[in-house]
Amino acid sequence: MHEMSVATSLLDIVREELGKHEVEKLLLVRVRYGALANLVPEALEFAFEVLTTGTDFEGARIELVQNPVRLACGGCGREFEPEGRELLFSPCPACGEEVGHTVLSGRDLYVEHIEAE
């Protein structure tokens, strides 16, 4: 379960940011992740809870927001958001090409917002 290491890294980032602003109590961390980031949201939420229990961050919430996938067609270059389960092999809405697309976004993972006091 790599979500545990992801949660550890996210908490390291949060701890560093809180130190910069001289606040200690974490209330909420909002994380954005791409649909291709290979994250299981429930597993990340569980890992966050496990890692914060018994720490200064106990009781803090994690909010996960999924970013859509954006592709550039390998045939005509049009940018689009694919639909369905086979995201990378979705046909281009302009020319119908199904392969050779370039991923423009959807693999990202970052802390978008931190609430603390």
Curated annotation (Swiss-Prot):
Cell division is among the record's keywords: no
Record-annotated membrane-spanning stretches: none
GO MF entries: nickel cation binding; zinc ion binding
Residue sites binding Ni(2+) per the record: H2
Keyword terms, alphabetized: Metal-binding, Nickel, Zinc
Residues that coordinate or bind Zn(2+): C73, C76, C92, C95
GO biological process annotation, one example: protein maturation
Cross-referenced InterPro entries: Hydgase_Ni_incorp_HypA/HybF_CS (IPR020538), HypA/HybF (IPR000688)
Membrane recorded as keyword: no
Family (UniProt): Belongs to the HypA/HybF family.
PANTHER family per the UniProt record, alphabetical: HYDROGENASE MATURATION FACTOR HYPA
Protein's job: Involved in the maturation of [NiFe] hydrogenases. Required for nickel insertion into the metal center of the hydrogenase.
Protein name: Hydrogenase maturation factor HypA 1
Source organism of the structure: Nitratidesulfovibrio vulgaris (strain ATCC 29579 / DSM 644 / CCUG 34227 / NCIMB 8303 / VKM B-1760 / Hildenborough) (Desulfovibrio vulgaris)
Lineage, top ranks: Bacteria, Pseudomonadati, Thermodesulfobacteriota, Desulfovibrionia, Desulfovibrionales
Gene: hypA1
